């Protein structure tokens, strides 16, 4: 009798994706982040579902409903902090996952890569709308500032902003629709993640060397399922340490003050994972220019397959490219730091320099270095 695992229409799909999947034998721990992202998404959906049972999306009661969750609901404080810090863990895994893709040339599978960039946008949109829901000071003013950026779009901008707000300012209508979208988007993200995997399994995984690995593949289970499990345990250890010991480490104290449209916080800033893009936005004195730079700072990822001019796929054997890759990483850390600082000297000029460097490395330096390396290897 043939194995049900290989014949059953549903189990067969799971088998081809997670059990009998031929996997390159040399993939390192950098390949763990896909499964960790799936794990983060599951945590976010489960904790979010339980939070939605007690949350009310009304401007009058939203803040107090979050307080009620933390004080009166059984383990409500745990669910709330797991959800808030789960977003941070999600973005840490996302940035490492994208960084791995850039370093090892995974963007050559451009369907998988482009779906991944769309996923990144969807996760960023979800996180932004989720940040508005507790209806604290930073929630309200963050929503006001970020949605207002759309007014920079010529001709339709102002109408578009008022349409998104559902009125002439961020109010009850805005909060209700943000809650609705925040609830539905994670399920769309889950569907997109399945498409992401579908495209990946069409080509098979990349590996650190960037070479074709068809002659050296091993089954995903038990080798990489155990490896992924270890990754999940390490993530859980870091995550629960964060949740149980320093739950407010990555949050903003201003969000413990109820939203007040008459009182602007001294420094309006988004969550830490958006600070790099926020710094790029602020470094351009023109509103429309800033918005375009903000969008392009993420959209630029879609250009990587076109900008890849090296004869080698991975950066593993390209020390010059490696050097500039790590300068790019350092530049992103600098932008993240600048995004959290007030708009004053010397932070303005540092932010502008870091923003120029970010686009220059990606659009000019890395392609040029790739050609130089080809030349050095007489290719």
UniProtKB/Swiss-Prot annotation:
Pfam hit, one: Cytochrome_B
Coiled coil: none
Binding site for heme b b566: 97, 196
UniProt xrefs under PROSITE patterns: CYTB_CTER, CYTB_NTER
Cellular component annotations (GO), alphabetically ordered: mitochondrial inner membrane; respiratory chain complex III
Oligomer status and interactors: The cytochrome bc1 complex contains 11 subunits: 3 respiratory subunits (MT-CYB, CYC1 and UQCRFS1), 2 core proteins (UQCRC1 and UQCRC2) and 6 low-molecular weight proteins (UQCRH/QCR6, UQCRB/QCR7, UQCRQ/QCR8, UQCR10/QCR9, UQCR11/QCR10 and a cleavage product of UQCRFS1). This cytochrome bc1 complex then forms a dimer.
Name of the protein this chain belongs to: Cytochrome b
């Amino acid at each position: 009798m043939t194995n049900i695992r290989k014949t059953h229409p549903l189990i067969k799909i799971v088998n081809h994706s997670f059990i009998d999947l031929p996997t390159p034998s040399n993939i390192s721990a950098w390949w763990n982040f896909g499964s960790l992202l799936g794990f983060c998404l599951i945590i976010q959906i489960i904790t979010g579902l339980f939070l939605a049972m007690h949350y009310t999306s009304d401007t009058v009661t939203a803040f107090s409903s979050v307080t009620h969750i933390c004080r009166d609901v059984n383990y409500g404080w745990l669910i709330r902090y797991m959800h808030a810090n789960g977003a941070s863990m999600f973005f840490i895994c996302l940035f490492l996952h994208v960084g791995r893709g850039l370093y090892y040339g995974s963007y050559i599978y451009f369907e998988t890569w482009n779906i991944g960039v769309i996923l990144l946008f969807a996760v960023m949109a979800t996180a932004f709308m989720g940040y508005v829901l507790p209806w604290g000071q930073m929630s309200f003013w963050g929503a006001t500032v970020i949605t207002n950026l759309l007014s920079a779009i010529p001709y339709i901008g102002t109408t578009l902003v008022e349409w998104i707000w559902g009125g002439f300012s961020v109010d009850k209508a805005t909060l209700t629709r943000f809650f609705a979208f925040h609830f539905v988007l994670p399920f769309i993200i889950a569907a997109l993640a399945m498409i992401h995997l579908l495209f990946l399994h069409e080509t098979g995984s990349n590996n650190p060397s960037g070479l074709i690995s068809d002659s050296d593949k091993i089954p995903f289970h038990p080798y990489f399922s155990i490896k992924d499990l270890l990754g999940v345990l390490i993530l859980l250890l870091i995550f629960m340490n964060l949740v149980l010991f320093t739950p407010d480490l990555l949050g903003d104290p201003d969000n413990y003050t109820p939203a007040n449209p008459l009182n602007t916080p001294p420094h309006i800033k988004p969550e830490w994972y958006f600070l790099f893009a926020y710094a790029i936005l602020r470094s351009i004195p023109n509103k429309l220019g800033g918005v375009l730079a903000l969008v392009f700072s993420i959209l630029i990822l879609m250009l990587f397959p076109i900008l890849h001019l090296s004869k080698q796929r991975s950066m593993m054997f390209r020390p010059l490219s490696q050097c500039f890759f790590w300068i790019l990483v350092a530049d992103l850390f600098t932008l993240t730091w600048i995004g959290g600082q007030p708009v004053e000297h010397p932070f303005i000029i540092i932010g502008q320099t870091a923003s120029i460097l970010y686009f220059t490395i990606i659009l000019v330096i890395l392609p040029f270095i790739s050609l130089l390396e080809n030349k050095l290897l007489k290719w």
